[in-house]
Structures are given as C-alpha cells and as structure tokens.
C-alpha cells in the first residue's frame, strides 16, 4: 500500500476509536477495504470527475482520490461527524481534488455533471440510479460497490457486474439505462 493510503488508514483508525466511522478495528481489517475501493481502476474507463454518494469514512472516494489526483471528486455526506472527518482528511493529506458537501443526495440541487458516480453501502442500486442520474454525463457510468444482494436489487447483465472475492462491482453506463 502506498504511503498516502497508509496515512489515510492510520488517520481513519485513530478517528475510529472515538467516532465509530468504520467497522475496521486495525490495519489488517482496513487494508482489504482500501484494496476493494481501488480494484475497479483495473476495469473502468478513464474519468475526469466523480460524485461519491454517502462518503462516510471515505471509502471508496478517498483511496480513489489519492490514486487519481488529476480527477475532481465531490463527496456527498450528510452526517456531521463523517463530514468533519472528510474535511480533516482534506486538511492533512494531499486531497486538493476533493470537495465535501454536507447534504443528502435527495437534497443536493447542484447542476453538476460528472463522468462517474460511486457509492458503497448506501442504498439500493435502483434508488441510487433514480436519484443521481441527473448528475451523470450522457457518456458517464455508475459504479456501485455491492455484495451478493445486487441481483435482488436490480437486473444487470454479466458485462455490468464484476466480482472480486465477496464484492460485486456494478458498473453501468447511463446510455444503457434506456
């Protein structure tokens, strides 16, 4: 793991002791989650902008932003302590490419258009698509980090679902929604 990702992990574990941001209690539990956040970089198309919904403890947005400093990330996180954590990360790590918005997806009224929309452990895929597609460029993609329950949430083709260990990555273009 690169040093910046190690710094992120260390800070998250420190904050986690008092703020309960993640279920991970140590680096050996957190490291696979960071690897999981970065895995889609192996198969997704290049992107210049990303909206992360329900950023929480920063997964997947912070590892992605650290690995892709040229990409603009907008992190939507409505909970105060989690937004404070994300703002702290921005102040101590080289994360000039992120903007933290303390709002729920349903309350976010910006006209922004992004290349990629990500989310991990927030809501059903169909809900996320319905509420967020207006922020996605016509040639953009959704990337949702899901578990085996994905097939119960939404119909998807094998070409839209990528598996790694127990994770299912749902990767679907906006164009294919029609």
Swiss-Prot record:
Protein name per UniProt: Ribosomal RNA small subunit methyltransferase G
Function text: Specifically methylates the N7 position of guanine in position 527 of 16S rRNA.
Keyword rRNA processing found: yes
CDD domains with a match to the protein in the record: AdoMet_MTases
Gene: rsmG
EC number(s) given by UniProt: 2.1.1.170
Species assigned in the record: Helicobacter pylori (strain ATCC 700392 / 26695) (Campylobacter pylori)
Binding site for S-adenosyl-L-methionine: 54, 59, 105-106, 120
Protein family membership: Belongs to the methyltransferase superfamily. RNA methyltransferase RsmG family.
UniProt GO molecular function: rRNA (guanine-N7-)-methyltransferase activity
